[in-house]
Amino acid sequence: VTCDLLSIKGVAEHSACAANCLSMGKAGGRCENGICLCRKTTFKELWDKRF
C-alpha cells in the first residue's frame, strides 16, 4: 500500500516503505513494482553486526 499511494512522488515511496519496514523491526525496505519489500534482516541483527 505504501508504494502504490506514493508512486507519483518517486523517492518518497521508498522512504515510506523503508519507514514502514523499520516499524515492523526490519532493517529497511524498498518499493519494487508497486510492492513494498522489507529486508529479511532485522534491525537488531544489523545493529549487532555493526557494533
From Swiss-Prot:
Its main location: secreted. The keyword Coiled coil does not apply. One of its GO terms (biological process) is defense response to fungus. Pfam families: Defensin_2 (PF01097). The modification Phenylalanine amide is found at F51. InterPro entries: Defensin_insect (IPR017982), Defensin_invertebrate/fungal (IPR001542), Scorpion_toxin-like_sf (IPR036574). SUPFAM superfamilies: Scorpion toxin-like (SSF57095). Induction: By bacterial infection. It comes from the Eukaryota. PROSITE patterns: INVERT_DEFENSINS. It is found in: Secreted. One of its GO terms (cellular component) is extracellular region. Disulfide bonds join C3-C31, C17-C36, C21-C38. Keywords: Amidation, Antibiotic, Antimicrobial, Defensin, Disulfide bond, Fungicide, Immunity, Innate immunity, Secreted. Belongs to the invertebrate defensin family. Type 1 subfamily. Antibacterial peptide against Gram-positive and Gram-negative bacteria and fungi. This is Defensin. It comes from Bombus pascuorum (Common carder bumblebee).
